[in-house]
């Protein structure tokens, strides 16, 4: 309902790269900056019944992942979305497991997946959802494991996020999945902002300005999605993630919530 209400509200103001840069300087020093700013939030969440159950599931799944080989780059037709999603799930789960447990094995396995993905020749920009989800994975791992990464890994992951994630998004438009693609690009831009501030600010402003028409098309007038509930869930998950990242890193969602 709240998403659908956006269509009835006054249009959110446009964001400029200059404003994004100012907000970043005021709010986003240090890591983590994606989704939360203090890992103690995780400890607080474990005190609830839901948080305790989720912690058990995360640690269980991460324990199994320790024995898995890294994910191979394998095409299915013209896409590798299952590869990107697998990597996203592994890196996110392993990074959270490390922060919950302090067990370095989880972090090391996440970094191994990141090195492997960074070595892919590309992230398949012909099917840009693949790029978006893989960029989100790499950004999350980079941000949440930043203090454990040596300088070589930091540079490797920064370069991969920019060259295989963000820069291809400025090519000839071949996709219309605004919520998913801009969530991935925003994650990458926020995570490695200092590496290329001008590109990062432009990328984030572009995402903020793209989202209102996409949300209107997706949820107006009653919250239903024209392509059905599965795509509603898919787009909405990334829509919410994008707003959460803007709020945690920049201190505002630009009136989009």
Specify the residue positions occupied by each region the protein language model found.
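Short acidic, Pro/Gly- and aromatic-enriched capping/linker segments at domain boundaries
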Residues: 15-32
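Aromatic-lined, polymer-binding surfaces characteristic
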Residues: 25, 33, 39, 46-47, ...
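Sec-dependent signal peptide recognition
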Residues: 1-2
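Bacterial Sec-dependent signal peptides at the C-terminal "C-region" and cleavage site
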Residues: 6-18
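Aromatic-rich surface patch/π-platform used for binding flat ligands and interfaces
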Residues: 64
């Amino acid at each position: 309902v709240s998403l659908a209400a956006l269509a009835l509200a006054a249009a959110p103001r446009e964001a400029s790269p200059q404003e994004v840069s100012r907000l970043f300087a005021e709010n986003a020093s240090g890591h983590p900056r994606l989704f939360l700013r203090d890992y103690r939030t995780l400890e607080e969440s474990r005190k609830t019944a839901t948080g305790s159950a989720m912690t058990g599931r995360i640690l269980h799944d991460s324990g199994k992942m320790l024995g898995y080989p890294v994910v191979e780059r394998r095409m299915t037709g013209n896409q590798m979305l299952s590869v990107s999603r697998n990597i996203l799930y592994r890196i996110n789960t392993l990074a959270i497991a490390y922060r919950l447990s302090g067990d370095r094995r989880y972090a090391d396995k996440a970094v191994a997946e990141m090195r492997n993905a960074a070595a892919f020749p590309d992230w398949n920009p012909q099917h840009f959802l693949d790029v978006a989800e893989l960029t989100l994975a790499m950004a999350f791992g980079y941000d949440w494991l930043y203090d454990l990464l040596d300088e070589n890994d930091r540079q490797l992951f920064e370069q991969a996020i920019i060259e295989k994630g963000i820069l291809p998004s400025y090519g000839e438009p071949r996709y219309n999945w605004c919520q998913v693609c801009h969530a991935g690009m925003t994650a990458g831009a926020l995570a490695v902002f200092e590496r290329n501030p001008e590109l990062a600010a432009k990328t984030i402003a572009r995402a903020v300005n793209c989202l209102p028409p996409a949300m209107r098309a997706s949820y107006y007038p009653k919250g239903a999605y024209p392509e059905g509930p599965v795509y509603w869930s898919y787009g909405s998950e990334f829509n919410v993630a994008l707003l959460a990242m803007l709020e945690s890193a920049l201190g505002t969602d630009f009136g989009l919530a």
